[in-house]
A protein has these predicted regions:
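Outer-membrane beta-barrel "beta-signal"
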Residues: 251-253, 351, 372-392
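Gram-negative outer-membrane beta-barrel proteins
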Residues: 41-47, 82-86, 115-119, 157, ...
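Outer membrane beta-barrel
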Residues: 29-173, 180-198, 301-322
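Detector for outer-membrane/organellar transmembrane beta-barrel domains
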Residues: 199-335
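N-terminal secretory signal peptides that target proteins for export/translocation
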Residues: 1-9
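Bacterial N-terminal signal peptides
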Residues: 12-23
Length: 392
């Protein structure tokens, strides 16, 4: 995705002018404007993570949305984040969506979050933890958004049934091809769910993603970069998936409980996802010692709001994969693959005096081939202005 880096001197003036222009125009155009401020501190960088060691700007958002007319609505989301001492401005969403198609169909076009999985189409500030699960960071770069189109259908019934198909450029998931397929990614997703009385509800989904530009291949030793340099701008930080392949399959399940249906007082959410990535390498790369065509990962998490202002969350996840630096030198190859597995356990405690402000403390234990690590993190997530309801 296109990223604009702006200096500390310029950014304050740029956003002050932008905010003044937006607020003036919004009064006339009846545009909903929302801001999410996200900042954090952590004692070490996370494996495949996106946040710097120490203090950093997390995933702060400026959201503009409005109905265009009775046929269309639109939304634009820009994100500010800091990586390696630089501040990045990124356009995360810029889409239009139909409002009047018959029979429960909707068409969305532009830059949008893919509808695969449970977490991917949610904004990062909705999460119960500072970073997405390791399997999301490894296979989707945290969350996958792209330029393309999405067609969805919601069944007109009490039983929840929604399906969607998507076509995207695939650039964020490109393994480094010099002439990639222009429409490189196709996805499909099916979700079902229901309420069980007033206290319980559940949702189950299956997803599939085809990535025409996802198979990794051997680069020459004289190349300026390897297959994934464009995903890693600095060591330890990911701006895209660490692992790509041609086929990605996933399934997710979520269950929610609230005594007497009162989510404001006490509630519990349990969710889990499993992802399987296949066809990772082209034939030449597949013959490298240690190569494995499949990688897989999963996580399970529980978030329990035991008081109106307090939530305790815990999550465990794993990724099983091989990693290596392989390149061609003349008529032979250099390098090999070795285990790159990661196990991760998180515990977080949130204080939230309202729906719009949250302070989080988190402890993470990572176990991988490079050694074990314990991370301590603090985060604030504050929002003001228009704030739309969160999805299930």
């Amino acid at each position: 995705m296109d990223v604009v880096r702006i200096s500390a001197v310029k950014k304050s003036g740029l956003f002050l002018c932008g905010a003044m222009l937006i607020s003036s125009s919004a009064v006339k155009a009846n545009i909903d404007i929302g801001v999410v401020l996200d900042g954090s501190y952590q004692n070490e960088s996370r494996h495949w993570g996106s946040r710097d060691k120490g203090f950093s700007l997390g995933h702060s958002e400026l959201v503009l949305s409005s109905n265009i007319d009775h046929h269309f609505k639109g939304q634009l989301v820009t994100v500010l984040a800091s990586h390696g001492g630089e501040t990045e401005l990124e356009l995360e969403e810029a889409w239009i969506e139909t409002l009047s198609l018959p029979l429960g169909f909707k068409l969305k076009a532009g830059r949008l979050l893919s509808h695969i999985g449970y977490l991917n189409n949610k904004h990062m500030h909705e999460d119960a933890f500072i970073e997405r699960p390791a399997v999301y960071r490894a296979f989707l770069g945290g969350h996958y958004f792209d330029d393309g189109v999405q067609m969805s259908w919601l069944a007109p019934s009490d039983f929840y049934l929604q399906t969607s198909i998507e076509a995207f450029s695939g650039k964020p998931l490109d393994a480094g091809y010099s002439d990639p397929v222009s429409v490189g990614v196709y996805t499909a997703n099916v979700q079902i769910g229901a309420d069980l009385g007033v206290e319980h509800s559940w949702r189950w989904g299956v997803s599939a993603l085809y990535n025409a530009n996802g198979r990794q291949f051997v680069h020459s030793e004289s190349s300026d970069h390897n297959a994934h340099d464009h995903h890693h701008d600095h060591a330890g930080h990911s701006h895209g998936p660490a692992i790509t392949g041609r086929h990605l399959y996933g399934t997710d399940f979520t269950w929610k409980w609230a005594p007497e249906g009162n989510y404001r007082q006490t509630n519990l959410r349990a969710s889990s996802e499993f992802w399987y990535l296949d066809n990772r390498f082209d034939p030449q790369m597949a013959n490298v010692p240690g190569a494995e065509q499949a990688a897989q990962g999963w996580y399970a998490e529980v978030a329990y709001q035991f008081q109106p202002s307090w939530t305790m969350s815990t999550r465990y996840g794993e990724v099983r994969t091989v990693e290596g630096d392989v390149h061609a030198h003349g008529d032979h190859l250099h390098g090999e693959f070795s285990r790159g597995d990661l196990k991760e356990w998180d515990v977080a405690l949130d204080w939230h005096a309202s729906h719009f402000g949250r302070i989080r403390g988190q402890v993470t234990y990572e176990e991988n081939v490079d050694g074990d690590e314990t991370l301590f993190s603090l985060q604030y997530v504050m929002s003001f202005g228009a704030h739309h309801a969160h999805a299930f």
